């Protein structure tokens, strides 16, 4: 039977004097007396009587033996108590760490910190995403699914089950296919609406066909008879033509337009080619400056010739040296 630590301290087993009383080196009759065991004899007197018998040579050996004996007694007392204590129980002195290992006694909060570290490591590791195997549809299955989608975008459960049996697919796969197909259909509808809005916007008006110009509107407003009839020879019809150059006010009244703006030639040029056939041959020769065959029909050719002569004389006068 092992005694508790207070009883051991009382009878002096942990003290140097108690060990000296039990050491085999001393006298058994004097050291193991009843008074020494019960503690009636003072330790100082026992130590004094024993130290007088011990030689100085054996003093170091006695100290070493006493230290070893004390450690051996302490281990013998602690280990049997750990065997009898269960988890969560305490001994008679309320020490909750005697039934635990040395690492738990030294650092009771170490286990909780280790568990917290494990939890934090598990949280830091990214969770693996569950990947579902993608279903590969055959051409026949896609054809039947598209036909069913054209009939109804939201088929009921019975229709989906019949279609699933027809195409040899699970009903869940058919339902997911219809969901994805409806999403695709909504995206297409939105794209069509946005494209129509962009076409109607004024920003893209420059891409359209150009508007008819004012000149074409003016020409279209003129009657065709005025272009085809020979009344174009008068001045009012010539002035109504687009691009007609009138006589500047600074020129004298005797000025006449050049012969290539002859009303007869203009009328011939404005007639359609289908009615007129090939254009008339060019009348002017090589010496167009000196010979003006078209002016012979014009009664005002004398005034034009006089003006040209004056222009030539002026050019010759400028070119002469002083």
From Swiss-Prot:
Tissue occurrence: Highly expressed in anterior neural plate followed by neural retina, pigmented epithelium, in pineal gland, diencephalon floor and epiphysis. At later stages, the neuroretina remains the primary site of expression. No expression in the developing lens and cornea.
Location(s) in or outside the cell: Nucleus
Superkingdom to which the source organism belongs: Eukaryota
Motif window: Nuclear localization signal: 308-312
SUPFAM superfamilies attached to this UniProt entry: Homeodomain-like (SSF46689)
Pfam families named among the record's database cross-references: Homeodomain (PF00046), OAR (PF03826)
GO molecular function annotation: DNA-binding transcription factor activity, RNA polymerase II-specific; RNA polymerase II cis-regulatory region sequence-specific DNA binding
Gene3D superfamilies for this protein: Homeodomain-like
GO process terms (BP): positive regulation of transcription by RNA polymerase II; regulation of transcription by RNA polymerase II
Comp. bias (Polar residues): 100-117
Motif (OAR): 302-315
Residues that span the membrane, as ranges: none
Residues within the DNA-binding region(s): 130-189
Keyword Kinase: no
GO cellular component: nucleus
Chain spans, region Disordered: 75-136
InterPro entries on file: HD (IPR001356), Homeobox_CS (IPR017970), Homeodomain-like_sf (IPR009057), OAR_dom (IPR003654), RAX/RAX2 (IPR043562)
Position of sequence motif Octapeptide motif: 32-39
Major location (coarse): nucleus
UniProt biased composition (Basic and acidic residues): 75-87
Keywords annotated in UniProt: Developmental protein, DNA-binding, Homeobox, Nucleus, Transcription, Transcription regulation
Family named by the database record: Belongs to the paired homeobox family. Bicoid subfamily.
Function: Plays a critical role in eye formation by regulating the initial specification of retinal cells and/or their subsequent proliferation.
Protein name, UniProt field: Retinal homeobox protein Rx-A
Classification lineage: Eukaryota, Metazoa, Chordata, Craniata, Vertebrata
């Amino acid at each position: 039977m092992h005694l508790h630590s207070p009883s051991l301290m009382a009878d002096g087993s942990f003290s140097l004097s108690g060990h000296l009383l039990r050491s085999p080196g001393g006298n058994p009759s004097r050291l193991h007396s009843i008074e020494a065991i019960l503690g009636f004899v003072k330790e100082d007197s026992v130590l004094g009587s024993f130290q007088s018998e011990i030689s100085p040579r054996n003093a170091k050996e006695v100290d070493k033996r006493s230290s070893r004996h004390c450690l051996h007694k302490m281990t013998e007392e602690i280990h049997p108590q750990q065997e009898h204590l269960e988890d969560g129980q305490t001994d008679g002195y309320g020490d909750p760490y005697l039934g635990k290992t040395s690492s738990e006694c030294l650092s009771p909060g170490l286990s909780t910190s280790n568990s917290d570290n494990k939890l934090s490591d598990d949280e830091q590791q990214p969770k693996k995403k569950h990947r579902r195997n993608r279903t590969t549809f055959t051409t026949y299955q896609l054809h039947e699914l598209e036909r069913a989608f054209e009939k109804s975008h939201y088929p009921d459960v019975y229709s989906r089950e019949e279609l699933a049996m027809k195409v040899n697919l699970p009903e869940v796969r058919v339902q997911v296919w219809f969901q994805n197909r409806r999403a695709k259909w909504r995206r297409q509808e939105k794209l069509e609406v946005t494209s129509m809005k962009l076409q109607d916007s004024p920003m893209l008006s420059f891409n359209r066909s150009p508007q008819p110009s004012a000149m074409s509107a003016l020409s279209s407003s003129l009657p065709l008879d005025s272009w085809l009839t020979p009344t174009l020879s008068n001045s009012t019809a010539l002035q109504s033509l687009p691009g007609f150059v009138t006589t500047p006010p600074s020129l004298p009244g005797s000025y006449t337009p050049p012969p290539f703006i002859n009303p007869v030639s203009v009328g011939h040029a404005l007639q359609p080619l289908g009615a007129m056939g090939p254009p008339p041959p060019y009348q002017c020769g090589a010496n167009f400056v000196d010979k003006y065959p078209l002016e012979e029909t014009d009664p005002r050719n004398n005034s034009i010739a006089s003006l040209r002569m004056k222009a030539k004389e002026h050019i010759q006068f400028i070119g002469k040296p002083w």
